[in-house]
């Protein structure tokens, strides 16, 4: 497990400054994908992708952390200065300078067999020209794994206080960011049977939203409060070393705890089935591809059942030791923020190119698409994304990152859909990170 711990630290190494830019620039349902908020190394949450140019080991530029017994402690702080050209995502843009502060603490065991990891982070953004848009997010998680013979038990718990910005897909045109709280508990048990492994898992997540205002009028958000229970089974069969056939079966139950008076409940049950291959055997081509189908049944007769093809895919191409090209695709059915709309089909595609210009100068360019197709005739939202970044690894403790992100979002003209609408937005960010 020591090797796993060290690789987790390496995977976290470069991307933090870029991730902070994404907090400002990226919209959509990412806010509810919990793994996006925790680094690799937190059992149950952090998911390390295949090694890319940005995530590969660079011992001379990695901050080693501080050893406390059998634990490695990594405190970090980042300071950023940004400019957002369209804070409100409107046709008449208003910009603002932003000062960001991001302290974090990652703690990992360095045991040979089992593992424990914890993470705490805070994101504070001060909008100098639009102070009412300032917000502070924080998140904390702890998880662990326990080896039981050849099997493995994984347990994790997390608490997050976040804000939904009005520029996100499916977001309401609120006067200020909508605060919401997420609590999550998850457990899984991997049964190893020679070349076959079976992992049953159980996740329970609660969402609680604070009230906001729209054009100065009170807009309670408690109708979005919900409890989500997910049970899943994942089977992996080893076709060859580092090449696996994967089958995933999931059942989901969403229960809204504060339904609107006079409105049908948005409670639902969902069923997902995916099949695919995870192949990490080739140094040049690595891919994880799952495709399948999802059915969503709603408790209220006013909402028709909905079904759609779904996918979870990632392809990494390494044409040379200095460049990697990563393509990702996700498609799923999500719960909606809009009143009277039970959900939407969400599609996200992204292409990212990472290049090592020098050993300590790393470049990245990406383009992407996000699309939300709302149920009950609620219209559509589409966002086109483009971004570039450069990271200078100064030494083992300091690095400087510059990022630029552009968003072009096109919303439906359907009057029942309360979203921001059409807008373009540019964000430039300069971040200095210091870590021990």
Regions found by a protein language model. Give the residues of each.
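Gram-negative and organellar
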Residues: 31-436
